[in-house]
Structures are given as structure tokens and as C-alpha cells.
């Protein structure tokens, strides 16, 4: 019987040191090659937990990375398989993310943005010349070689990259990160190299003003904006940007990929190749301020998602082998959330723009006019139940990358039963109609309390709202929003995920559901609401109240609360408080002045309906925010609220809060 020889080449040739990044099935560690003393970043993937498809993607990524040898691309130096583990040895990139470096600069101009996009385009051009399409260009994947001034920009994470022949256009699957997806991908048409140029256009837009061109709280509307090319250049921030810069953006964000500028052509654009005479040298302080908020929002979302995914060991679409290389600031596992329709759906995209009717190509675009800073800090609220199979129902969005290469319209049962392998992404994706794999940037370690709570979410099962066993088919009183996606054998993923996000529950039926209106009255029809609908209404109203608190909006808060509101809360030192004056003090002196981004998570809300006009909700509330030193913090409270409906509107008449104060005080 032959003896199997186990490869130990990595162990023999490299010495491992400290961790610089971590994912669900991988870790990135600094290493030194013994024979030369050179430092690298080793991405160590636990292959014992990978599926056959994950192995194929790992091989594809390694193969692509070997092809790419360019000064603006994180380079793969070695790929070694040992028993149970695969080692990818990349450049050790120590400069952190490009966007983080920009906000730390004392001076930043249009000419600097031109230099940044030039390096990004050089990297993209090399990829395209080598027959590679990156498919996930975004700020998290743009790193700096070192902390030295003028360090080169490095493109990282080729976990979603594909190989193409020449200018081949084909359907390679639904992949990318929501705010950076091109119209052709969203329309599920054949695509190719132009998708990378579209993403470059989005990045350039952000580099110039600090917020993205496309953004909406509703992901469906976000995709509609992108497909329509609905962006604009609002005053006053765009008034100081040169016409040449706007012209390049317009050529990059051209809806028709055949007419979109190529990387080679973009590098010859006067704003890029003649920046010293064409690009403005004026310092863009407002852009830097907006970028700070943009970065803070990305980091906060990334921290939450990273914790969720790493804790729950999701392994869906792929195991990123990306050059997570790298720096403490940009490594991490690119986790595929693809088939994971049950995981983390995000309602908000990466952006920060408030809505207006101003637009370039459509009347439905968004614009950052006037109130950008508040919009950039708009608090987010996530609701996490303990539903069937541990699905997370969320109303918030992250930078999740998505990848769905198998089919345009997966079967409902496939989607709903897909939390199986895990490799988590930022994402998504993310996420498009279905969340997926993308790289995470390492962040300060989240509070242990978060992971403890998330572990409990992972262990949880059962739908919080259910008061009895679930039936095999849809309940008799489902809303049209849920019945819609189930009315055909192959519904759109986004419809299903939207219904999950709205808290309508997980469809159980695998067969076709009857088409047509539901047997019970829709929630929009006057009269008593079905209990499940009323419970969702209570949860939604509670979210609105918490958003008003996080926004420091006393007027909105007062509209939701009864004037005689009574409460027990930590701030009152155990005393029963009646009326609004006690709360007004915090709004006027603390909440209204809070300039830090806030994210609120409502864990396992339980609603008790008391007759037709009263209800009680109990939940755990996590408030995540950035403290004065720029570090992520978390506070927790346990809350109960009593609601009474008057004149068709729910009002909070009493609440009881224990634990930490409601408002973050740092």
C-alpha cells in the first residue's frame, strides 16, 4: 500500500507571525520567507470546510492572481496546498485603505483624485489586457503599498474575478457590490470588461465629492437608479469641479457598455494625462469631511457584518482567496453570501445622499444638495429575529458583495434552504437581489457582547412571531407582498428577499402558490389588521421611534409618543417619569449635537397584541457608535414599549428601559 506524502513546503519555507486579518474560514498572517528574510502576507484557508465549488473558486482566483504582475496590483508570490490548508502568499501591503489615507491628508485636490484614478485605471488596464475582469472594484479593495507619502495604490481581492477572451460578452453570473454594479449586470445581460469601468466611474465620483452617485434606502430603487443612469452633479459641491472631470465621469457612467470609455481611452483623457494643467489644485475640504463620514459608515457596517458572518460561520457563495493581503486595514475573508438569501439583507446602500428630484438621466435620481452631512450620518436600524433556520431579517444594508453564477432565477426552495457552506462577505453585497461574497476590511475588534448576542441569535430557531407550529403552506393571511414572490416557480430573488426583510416570514411552500389577491384583507384596507400584519406594524413604528432618537429629531419623536408618556429608564435613576419635558432635555442638549454615526439593532422583538388598539413590544436594543477617539463602541438595553392606537395612528404611551442609557454618551 502506497504511503501518502504530505506536502509541508509552506511550513518548511516560511515562518508565521501575528494575525493581520480574519474571516470565517481563513486568516491572514504576516510571514517571513526563511531563505530571504522578506516579509509577506499569508492567507491561510481552511480547505476542510470548503465545498467542491469553493475549491474551484479558490483555484480560479489563484490562477488569475498568478497572471497579474503590475505595480498597482497586489501580487501573489506563492500558492501552496498542505493537508487541510491552502496558503496564498501575497505582497505585505501596510498602507491601509486609500480612502482612509485621503481623509488623513492635510491637502487633497482634484489633481490628487486624478492621480488616484490613474493608478486604478492602470491596474484595470493590465487586468483587461490579461483577459481578466475584476468585477468587484470598490474602496475596500483599493490599498496603499506603504504609509510613505506618495505610496502606490494597489488593487486587491480577485475573489470574484473572471477570465474572458478579448472583448467577449457573456453572462458570467450576478456578482459585485450593490452601489458599484453596472446596468448590464442588473439587467442580467451579457457583460465583460466595461463593468470595471462603470465601477471606476462610481469611485471617481466619490473621490471628488465624498459620496456616491447612486444611493437609496430601498435597494430596488437603488438598482432602478443605476439602470437608468440617474445621477447628477448638484450644487454647490460640484460647482468647483472642472468640466473635464465631469466629462470623464459621464463617459465612465455611460449606460450602454458598447459606448462606455475603455481603460486605455480613459488613461488618455486630458483630465488624467494632463492633470497639471487641466485638473484643479484647489483644496477640497468639504470632500474630505464627506469622505470621513462615508468611511465611518462603511466601517461600522463592516464591523457588524464581519461579526455576524464570522460568528455564524456562513459559507455560501465562495471562500475569498483575495489578496486580503495585506494590511490590517483591508484584509479579511471575502465571504460569499450568494445563495444565502437568508442572511444579511441590507436596505441601505453604501451611500449617504439625501433624495431630491434632481437627476441627469431620470427624474428619480438622488442628490446630496444642502443636507449632506446629516444624511451621511443617518442612523441605521436593523431588526434581527430568531426566525426559522436562524435567518436574519434586516432592514439595513452593508457593503456586501454578491455572486450568483449558477442561474438567473433560482428556485424558491434553493434560495430559502441555502445557509450551508460558509465564507462570508462584505456585502454585499452586496447585495443585490442576493447577498454575496466580497472582501472585508479588518476593523477594531467588536465588543465581546456583540458576539455573545450574535451567538445566541445563531443558536436560535423558530419564528419569534409564531404562536404555534408553522404549517406546510403559506398561512391564510399572507400579505400580497409575500404572496407575490411565491406566485411563480422562479420568482426574482430580490422579491423573496424583500419579503423576508419586511418580516413577512420565510415561505415554506415549494409548490406554486395561487395567483391573485390573498384571502384575507390587505393591511392597506381600513379595518382590523390581521395579527401578523399588526405585529409588523408595531415593529416598524418602534424602528421609526428609535430612528427619531438617533437622529435627535424631537419633533418626529413627539409625534410618535403620547404627550403623557410614562417611562422607567436609567437616566431617571429608577423614577417614573411622565410627560415629554424630561426627554426633550436629551434631544436638545445631547442627541441633536451628536455628530457620530449610529447603528441600532433590535434583537428578537416580541409583540403582544392586546385587542384591536393596543399592543406591547419587548426587545433587546444594541446601539453601535463611534466614540470620541474614533473607536467602535456598543451599548445594550432591554426595552418594553406599550402602544395605543388613536385616530388610526400608533402612539407610545409607556416604555421601560433597563441596562445602559439609550443615548451613547461618548
Curated annotation (Swiss-Prot):
Record comment: activity regulation: Activated by Ca(2+)/calmodulin. Binding of calmodulin results in conformational change that relieves intrasteric autoinhibition and allows autophosphorylation of Thr-287 which turns the kinase in a constitutively active form and confers to the kinase a Ca(2+)-independent activity.
GO molecular function annotation: actin binding; ATP binding; calcium/calmodulin-dependent protein kinase activity; calmodulin binding; identical protein binding; protein homodimerization activity; protein serine kinase activity
Chain positions with Phosphoserine modification: 367, 394, 397
Domain of life the protein comes from: Eukaryota
Clinical disorder: Intellectual developmental disorder, autosomal dominant 54: A disorder characterized by significantly below average general intellectual functioning associated with impairments in adaptive behavior and manifested during the developmental period.
Residue spans crossing the bilayer: none
Induction remark: Activity is induced in skeletal muscle during exercise.
Annotated Low complexity bias: 479-491
Name of the protein this chain belongs to: Calcium/calmodulin-dependent protein kinase type II subunit beta
Known partners and oligomeric status: CAMK2 is composed of 4 different chains: alpha (CAMK2A), beta (CAMK2B), gamma (CAMK2G), and delta (CAMK2D). The different isoforms assemble into homo- or heteromultimeric holoenzymes composed of 12 subunits with two hexameric rings stacked one on top of the other. Interacts with SYNGAP1 and CAMK2N2. Interacts with MPDZ. Interacts with FOXO3. Interacts (when in a kinase inactive state not associated with calmodulin) with ARC; leading to target ARC to inactive synapses. Interacts with CAMK2N1; this interaction requires CAMK2B activation by Ca(2+).
Membrane topology value: Peripheral membrane protein
Chain residue ranges for the region called Autoinhibitory domain: 283-292
Organism expressing this protein natively: Homo sapiens (Human)
Modified residues (Phosphothreonine): 287, 306-307, 400-401
CDD domains: STKc_CaMKII (cd14086)
Catalytic reaction(s) noted: L-seryl-[protein] + ATP = O-phospho-L-seryl-[protein] + ADP + H(+); L-threonyl-[protein] + ATP = O-phospho-L-threonyl-[protein] + ADP + H(+)
Positions of the UniProt region annotated as Disordered: 349-534
Domain Protein kinase: 14-272
Sequence positions that bind ATP: 20-28, 43
Gene Ontology CC, one term: nucleoplasm
Chain positions covered by the region annotation Calmodulin-binding: 291-301
Record's comment describing the protein's domains: The CAMK2 protein kinases contain a unique C-terminal subunit association domain responsible for oligomerization.
Tissues of expression: Widely expressed. Expressed in adult and fetal brain. Expression is slightly lower in fetal brain. Expressed in skeletal muscle.
Keywords tagged on the record: Actin-binding, ATP-binding, Calmodulin-binding, Cytoplasm, Cytoskeleton, Developmental protein, Differentiation, Intellectual disability, Kinase, Membrane, Neurogenesis, Nucleotide-binding, Phosphoprotein, Sarcoplasmic reticulum, Serine/threonine-protein kinase, Synapse, Transferase
This enzyme's EC code(s): 2.7.11.17
Amino acid at each position: 500500500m502506497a504511503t501518502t506524502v504530505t506536502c509541508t513546503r509552506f511550513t518548511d519555507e516560511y515562518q508565521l507571525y501575528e494575525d493581520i486579518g480574519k474571516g470565517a474560514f481563513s486568516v491572514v498572517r504576516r510571514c517571513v520567507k526563511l531563505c530571504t528574510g522578506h516579509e509577506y502576507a499569508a492567507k491561510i484557508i481552511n480547505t476542510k470546510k470548503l465545498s467542491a465549488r469553493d475549491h474551484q473558486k479558490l483555484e480560479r482566483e489563484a490562477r488569475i492572481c498568478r497572471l497579474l504582475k503590475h505595480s498597482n496590483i497586489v501580487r501573489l508570490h506563492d500558492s501552496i496546498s498542505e493537508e487541510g490548508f491552502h496558503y496564498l502568499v501575497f505582497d505585505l501591503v501596510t498602507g491601509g485603505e486609500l480612502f482612509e489615507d485621503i481623509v488623513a491628508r492635510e491637502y487633497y485636490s482634484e489633481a490628487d483624485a486624478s492621480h488616484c484614478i490613474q493608478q486604478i485605471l492602470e491596474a484595470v488596464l493590465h487586468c483587461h489586457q490579461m483577459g481578466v475582469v475584476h468585477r468587484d472594484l470598490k474602496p475596500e479593495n483599493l490599498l496603499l503599498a506603504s504609509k510613505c507619502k506618495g505610496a502606490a495604490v494597489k488593487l486587491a481581492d480577485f475573489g470574484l474575478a473572471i477570465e474572458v477572451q478579448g472583448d467577449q460578452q457573456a453572462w458570467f453570473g450576478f456578482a459585485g457590490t450593490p452601489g458599484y454594479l453596472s446596468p448590464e449586470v442588473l439587467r442580467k445581460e451579457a457583460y465583460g470588461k466595461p463593468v470595471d469601468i462603470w465601477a471606476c466611474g462610481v469611485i471617481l465620483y466619490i473621490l471628488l465629492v465624498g459620496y456616491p452617485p447612486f444611493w437609496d434606502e430601498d435597494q430596488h430603487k437603488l438598482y432602478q437608479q443605476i439602470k437608468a443612469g440617474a445621477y447628477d452633479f448638484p450644487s454647490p459641491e460640484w460647482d468647483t469641479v472642472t468640466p473635464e472631470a465631469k466629462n470623464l465621469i459621464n463617459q465612465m457612467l455611460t449606460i450602454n457598455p458598447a459606448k462606455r470609455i475603455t481603460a486605455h481611452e480613459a488613461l488618455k483623457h486630458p483630465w488624467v494625462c494632463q492633470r497639471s494643467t487641466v485638473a484643479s489644485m484647489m483644496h477640497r475640504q468639504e470632500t474630505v469631511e464627506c469622505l470621513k463620514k462615508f468611511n465611518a459608515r462603511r466601517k461600522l457596517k463592516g464591523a457588524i457584518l464581519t461579526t455576524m458572518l464570522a460568528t455564524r460561520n456562513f459559507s455560501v457563495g465562495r471562500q475569498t482567496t483575495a489578496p486580503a493581503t495585506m494590511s490590517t486595514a483591508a484584509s479579511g475573508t471575502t465571504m460569499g453570501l450568494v445563495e444565502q438569501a437568508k442572511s444579511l439583507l441590507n436596505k441601505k446602500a453604501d451611500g449617504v445622499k439625501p433624495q431630491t428630484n434632481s437627476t441627469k438621466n431620470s427624474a428619480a435620481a438622488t442628490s446630496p444638495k444642502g443636507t449632506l452631512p446629516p444624511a451621511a450620518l443617518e442612523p441605521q436600524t436593523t431588526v434581527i429575529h430568531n426566525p426559522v433556520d436562524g435567518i436574519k431579517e434586516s432592514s439595513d444594508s452593508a457593503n456586501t458583495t454578491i455572486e450568483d453564477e449558477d442561474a438567473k432565477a433560482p428556485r424558491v426552495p434553493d434560495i430559502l434552504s441555502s445557509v450551508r457552506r460558509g465564507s462570508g462577505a462584505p456585502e454585499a453585497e452586496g447585495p443585490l437581489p442576493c447577498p454575496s461574497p466580497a472582501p472585508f476590511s479588518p476593523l477594531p475588534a467588536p465588543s465581546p457582547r456583540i458576539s455573545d448576542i450574535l451567538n445566541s441569535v445563531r443558536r436560535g430557531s423558530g419564528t419569534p412571531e409564531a404562536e404555534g407550529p408553522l404549517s406546510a403552506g403559506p398561512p391564510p393571511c399572507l400579505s400580497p407582498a409575500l404572496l407575490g414572490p411565491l406566485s411563480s416557480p422562479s420568482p426574482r430573488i430580490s422579491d423573496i428577499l424583500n419579503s423576508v426583510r419586511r418580516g413577512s416570514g420565510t415561505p415554506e411552500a415549494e409548490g406554486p402558490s395561487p395567483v391573485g389577491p390573498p384571502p384575507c384583507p390587505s393591511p392597506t384596507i381600513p379595518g382590523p389588521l390581521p395579527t401578523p400584519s399588526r405585529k409588523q406594524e408595531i415593529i416598524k413604528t418602534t424602528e421609526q421611534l428609535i430612528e427619531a432618537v438617533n437622529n435627535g429629531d424631537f419633533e418626529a419623536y413627539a409625534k410618535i409618543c403620547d404627550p403623557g408618556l410614562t417611562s422607567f429608564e436609567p437616566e431617571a435613576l429608577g423614577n417614573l417619569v411622565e410627560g415629554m419635558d424630561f426627554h426633550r432635555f436629551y434631544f436638545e442638549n445631547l442627541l441633536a449635537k451628536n455628530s457620530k454615526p449610529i447603528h441600532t439593532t433590535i434583537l428578537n422583538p416580541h409583540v403582544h397584541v392586546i385587542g384591536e388598539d393596543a399592543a406591547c413590544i419587548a426587545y433587546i436594543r444594541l446601539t453601535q457608535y463611534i466614540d470620541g477617539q474614533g473607536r467602535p463602541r456598543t451599548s445594550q438595553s432591554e426595552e418594553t414599549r406599550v402602544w395605543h392606537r388613536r385616530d388610526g395612528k400608533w402612539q407610545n404611551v409607556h416604555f421601560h428601559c433597563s441596562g445602559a442609557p439609550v443615548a451613547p454618551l461618548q
